[in-house]
C-alpha cells in the first residue's frame, strides 16, 4: 500500500467534483494511465460503476466501494464483466481552513489476488500519487474555477 497527501488551496467540494466525475480524471492522473471516460458518470454512492479507457486502449469497470459526498471516494478496478482482483484507489478530503483542503490519495494492493498484476502494483509509488495530487491542485487552484 502506498499513499501521499498534500494541502490544496481550494474547497473540498470543488476538489471532490474533479475526482467524482470520471471524465475529469485523465486531466489529473499522475500515472499517465487514463485516456478517457464517457461523460455523465458522476459518482454518487457505493455500488456505482464507472468505465474508463486506459492509455493502452483497454477498458476498466471501476466499482465504487466507499463513498461519502465531499469527503471520501474509493473504487476497485476490474476488466469488463469480471470481479475486481482486489486493488483499490482511495481519495480522502479533509477541510483545512477557509478554502483549503488536505487531500490523501491511497493505492492499496494488499488484497490483490492476480499475481500478474503485482509487479505493476508495486511500481506505483508515492511519487506517482503525488503527481496526481499536484495535477489535481493545479486544476482546482485555477482562478477561472469557482470554489
Label the model's feature ranges:
Residues 1-41:
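Hydrophobic ligand-binding cavity/cleft-lining segments
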Residues 3-5, 49-51, 74, 90-92, ...:
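Beta-strand secondary-structure signal
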Residues 6, 60-66, 77, 87-95:
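Hydrophobic/aromatic beta-strand elements that line small-molecule binding cavities or substrate pockets
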Residues 12-13, 65-70, 92-102:
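A short, structured loop/turn motif at beta-sheet edges
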Residues 36-82, 102, 138-147:
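Glycine-rich portal/gate segments that line the openings of hydrophobic small-molecule binding cavities
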Residues 79-131, 147:
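Beta-strand/loop substructures that line and gate deep hydrophobic ligand-binding cavities in soluble
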Amino acid at each position: 500500500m502506498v499513499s501521499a497527501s498534500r494541502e490544496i488551496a481550494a474547497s473540498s467540494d470543488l476538489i471532490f467534483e474533479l475526482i467524482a466525475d470520471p471524465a475529469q480524471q485523465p486531466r489529473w492522473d499522475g500515472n499517465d494511465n487514463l485516456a478517457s471516460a464517457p461523460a455523465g458518470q458522476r459518482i454518487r454512492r457505493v455500488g456505482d460503476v464507472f468505465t474508463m479507457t486506459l492509455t493502452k486502449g483497454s477498458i476498466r469497470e471501476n466499482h465504487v466501494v466507499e463513498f461519502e459526498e465531499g469527503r471520501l471516494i474509493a473504487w476497485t478496478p476490474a476488466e469488463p464483466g469480471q470481479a475486481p482482483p482486489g486493488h483499490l484507489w482511495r481519495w480522502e478530503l479533509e477541510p483545512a481552513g477557509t478554502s483549503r483542503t488536505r487531500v490523501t490519495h491511497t493505492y492499496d494492493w494488499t488484497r490483490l489476488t492476480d499475481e500478474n498484476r503485482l509487479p505493476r502494483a508495486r511500481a506505483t509509488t508515492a511519487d506517482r500519487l503525488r503527481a496526481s495530487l499536484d495535477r489535481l491542485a493545479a486544476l482546482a487552484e485555477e482562478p477561472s474555477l469557482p470554489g
